[in-house]
Amino acid sequence: SDDGMFFTPKSLVKMIVNILEPKSGILLDPACGSGGMFIQSGDFVNEAGMNANSTMTFYGQEKTPYNAQLCLMNMAVHGLTGVIKAGESANTFYHDAHNLDGRCDYVMANPPFNVDKVKAESCESAKRLPFGMPGINKDKEVGNANYLWISYFYSYLKEGGRAGFVMASSATDSQGKDKDIREKLIRTGHVDVMVSVGNNFFYTKSLPCSLWFFDKGKNEKTKDKLLFIDARNYYTVVDRTLNEWSEWQLKNLNAIVWLYRGEKEKYIALLNEYYTVLGYEKSFAEQIDELTEKIKQCKEEAKKAIENAGRNEKKKKQEEYVDKLSALSDILNVAKEAQWLYEKFGEGEYQDIPGLCKVAYTTEEAKIDSQGSISVEEKAWSLTPGAYVGVAPIEDDGVNFEERMAEIHRELLSLQAESNYLMEAISKNMKEMGI
């Protein structure tokens, strides 16, 4: 991974595919690696009742031949076919290997971040740069290729096409020529959704990243608007060095996009999924309280049962209660995700949520209502979600600050008195011992 290459975490791939919703046509991944975007897109199309090999045509470019072979094998295992080109002739910086500029229905990618020493002259001759070249250094090289990739992804799309890709977080706010390109890009009205991702989503690197989404076929509701989602604090911990989005978290983030697009029926369908799992009798909040109490009781019951079990039965009892607690915890997690979504959007009306999501206009001219609205132009063309969504309000924990401080003060005085008593006792003992 010295030149920025690393494989894409599955939950990021799923997020990209879920938001783009591929159905039919040409899908290009110009930095295809092991083919994760193709596999997930194939699954998405097949699960919708279609045949991915019949409705989709998969094209990939991959500079590293080994990765290209891995991609083809991976696709074959999943019953997919595609055209993958490898080697220097498939280096996307210098070659449109499939001649797909302006022809793609979908572009998905996780390109290597912050690549340097890209030959500027070769890039210019390879075209696909509708907004011009990024900054060029004295050696006639592009010092950071992030905006080459961003330009390519946009250029490959046909009218009505959609793109989704992973990018280094720094690209949302980089300056110089990058900022000029970003302004031109935003003014097209085709930047659709921006998502900030937290640390530790990658297996080998802890860096934060962003997901970018373009749509050259926006509906009237989203024309001249962008949705910003700051999901840096929304994830499931897998282990000390790895985070991910669970299936329900992916659906919840996707639901925000549905409501932004005016697709309320999809949101209602998700609520019904939650009700199918949890039941309709009680609110999500009530079920959280009930399940939390059940888990507490189950732990107490498990402790007693294991203590009272014979030596030969202890392991069996432990396994039995581990399974019970795991099942209860799984349901509790579903209830928490249901409540997370419902308390924000209720029966399906989009609203800006401080610290989570914000809809902004592209330009000052596009703003049709001034109250509470903001444009990307007035934020100096930044695409950093955190600059728009703000900070989530601090939840009231029900503790009176003054009372709690007085209580802490009393505790400190008590500890101080105890400390003084102990010091006196120690000194007295040491004197008696002649020390």
Residue ranges, per PLM feature:
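Conserved S-adenosyl-L-methionine
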Residues: 2-109, 114-125, 132-136, 147-148, ...
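A conserved structural/catalytic subdomain of Rossmann-like adenosyl-cofactor enzymes
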Residues: 101-431
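ABC ATP-binding cassette signature C-motif
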Residues: 433-435
